[in-house]
From Swiss-Prot:
<dbReference type="GO" id="GO:0005576">
    <property type="term" value="C:extracellular region"/>
</dbReference>
<dbReference type="GO" id="GO:0016064">
    <property type="term" value="P:immunoglobulin mediated immune response"/>
</dbReference>
<feature type="region of interest" description="Complementarity-determining-1">
    <location>
        <begin position="49"/>
        <end position="53"/>
    </location>
</feature>
<keyword id="KW-1064">Adaptive immunity</keyword>
<feature type="region of interest" description="Framework-1">
    <location>
        <begin position="19"/>
        <end position="48"/>
    </location>
</feature>
<feature type="region of interest" description="Complementarity-determining-2">
    <location>
        <begin position="68"/>
        <end position="84"/>
    </location>
</feature>
<keyword id="KW-1280">Immunoglobulin</keyword>
<feature type="signal peptide">
    <location>
        <begin position="1"/>
        <end position="18"/>
    </location>
</feature>
<protein>
    <recommendedName>
        <fullName>Ig heavy chain V region 1B43</fullName>
    </recommendedName>
</protein>
<keyword id="KW-1015">Disulfide bond</keyword>
<dbReference type="InterPro" id="IPR036179">
    <property type="entry name" value="Ig-like_dom_sf"/>
</dbReference>
<dbReference type="Pfam" id="PF07686">
    <property type="entry name" value="V-set"/>
</dbReference>
<dbReference type="InterPro" id="IPR013106">
    <property type="entry name" value="Ig_V-set"/>
</dbReference>
<dbReference type="GO" id="GO:0019814">
    <property type="term" value="C:immunoglobulin complex"/>
</dbReference>
<keyword id="KW-0732">Signal</keyword>
<dbReference type="InterPro" id="IPR050199">
    <property type="entry name" value="IgHV"/>
</dbReference>
<keyword id="KW-0391">Immunity</keyword>
Length: 116
């Protein structure tokens, strides 16, 4: 059995930094017990200039879960329920931030979003 991973484009709210775009990339499927690695590429704004940069996911049935964020300073905060399995890092030279979720199971089947 595989864990289904869906990626979607998530953009800023209209009228507020409307040229900022966030684009997720990574695998569509990950096998149970493997690690999920996703990339969020930000255009139109430097991730070191401000804000916190988040990962969230939406489960089948539309339940949302906040996973964690990396602050523009580089500090991170994680959902306590995921803390033992999650890491969020960044590459400031590429204006990207990353999600790694270890030891995935079928319960991690969701659509994954990055957001500001």
């Amino acid at each position: 059995m595989r864990v289904l991973i869906l990626l979607c484009l998530f953009t800023a709210f209209p009228g507020i930094l409307s040229d900022v775009q966030l684009q997720e990339s990574g695998p569509d499927l990950v096998k149970p017990s493997q690690s999920l690695s996703l990339t969020c590429t930000v255009t139109g704004y430097s991730i070191t200039s401000g804000y916190s940069w988040h990962w969230i996911r939406q489960f089948p049935g539309n339940k949302l879960e906040w996973m964690g964020y990396i602050h523009y300073s580089g500090n991170t905060s994680y959902n306590p329920s995921l803390k033992s399995r999650i890491s969020i890092t960044r590459d400031t030279s590429k204006n990207q931030f990353f999600l790694q979720l270890n030891s995935v199971t079928t319960e991690d089947t969701a659509t994954y979003y990055c957001a500001r």
